[in-house]
Amino acid sequence: MADERNPNQIIRKDARNCFVESLSDAFGNSRAHFAFATYDLSKPAGHRQTNSIHIYISIPELLELCRKLSCGELRYIMQQKKQTGDSKPIQEWLGGTSAEKLRQYGKARPDGKSLSRVCKLLVGQKTDFLLIADSGPGDKDVKGLIVPRFGNKPENHVAVSMTYDALSELLLMTKMHYESWLTAWYLSQTHSGQQQNHVPANNKPPAKYSFQAGVSECSCEKMF
């Protein structure tokens, strides 16, 4: 069973027939990669996955969320939203792949639209948090952002219920692994004799990735 583990997996959190896992394969692009999936155990092995959504969050946004978690601000926000019945997301990340890129990858949608992916962190009614990922049709606006056009009917939907501790483990383990990766990067620069003042993000990611940045939301989405 150990051989089946994704070598890039940092940590995985399971809920009922779904999970989210944090992966380390996008650190070089200054992104944290969260893979969401649902599954049906009644189906044959190899065909059990029913939804799959990849969400990429910028490292600065991840670190800011970890700061809120560590200082207690996130717990305070959660408690206030529960008391007032506020159902608005604590945080939301927008991403996707444009229709042009989909055509380049040979993955054009039948409707000709872009592929939108959205991730939301909300306060749950029966648990502390819900970490939700949705995907479906979208349109690219004048700023190049992929705007979702699926309303409340996404083509793929994964909602992972999490306790405060579970979310803490997911975020802080990801932060710790990124910091370890960053330390290793600096050491590699020292040993190679290179002198650089900053970590260079890969401005030209592999073709299977598509990036989008917003005013307060930033993510990149993986093609599959």
Give the role of each language-model region.
Residues 25-44, 130-143:
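A short, structured beta-strand/loop element
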Residues 20-28, 55-59, 120-125, 158-166:
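Short, low-complexity cationic-aromatic patches
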Residues 87-157:
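Short, solvent-exposed interaction modules
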Residues 1-27, 210, 217-223:
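An N-terminus-focused feature that recognizes amino-terminal "leader" regions
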Residues 137-224:
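Mixed-charge, glycine-accented linear interaction segment located at domain edges/termini
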Residues 38-58, 143-160:
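A cross-kingdom feature marking solvent-exposed beta-strand/loop segments within repeated
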Residues 54-81, 161-187:
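DNA replication sliding-clamp ring fold and its partner-interaction surfaces
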